[in-house]
Amino acid sequence: MKQLIAISAIGNDRTGLVYDLTRVVVECGGNVLESRMTALGNEFAVLMLVAGNWHTLAKLEGELAKLGESSGLTVISRRTEIRPPRTDMVSYTVDVVCLDQPGVLHSLAGFFSSRGIDIGDISTRTYNAAHTGAPMFSL
C-alpha cells in the first residue's frame, strides 16, 4: 500500500544538495511525487512529498536523519495522507505587485483568512524596479 511522507530540509546552499537528498529517496525505494526547492539567502530549502510502502518510508526516515547529521542539513519528516480534492471550492490565482514594505504578506494572508479562503500555494520575492530602483514585492 502506498504511503506518503512530507520532507522538509534546509541547509547551506551548495552544489549537490538536491542530488544527495534524492539519492537517499531513490536508494530507499521512494518516489518523489511533488517538490518545491529554492535558495533563500545562503540557504537552500527543499519540500518534498515522497511515496513508498511502509518499509520504504521507515528506512527513509532513518537515512534522512543520517544525512542530516553528516551534511549539516536540518531535516524534518512527517507521515501524511493524500489531500482529498476540494469540490466545494473554486480555485483562484492571485498576482500582486506592489512597493515592498513590512507586513505585506501578513496583510494579504489576513485578508484571505478573514474570508475563509485557504492558501494552497504561495511564492513571494522582492526586487528593485528596473527604472526607478524602488523596492518591489511580488506574490
Regions found by a protein language model. Name each.
Residues M1-L139:
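A conserved regulatory-domain signal marking ACT and ACT-like small-molecule sensing domains
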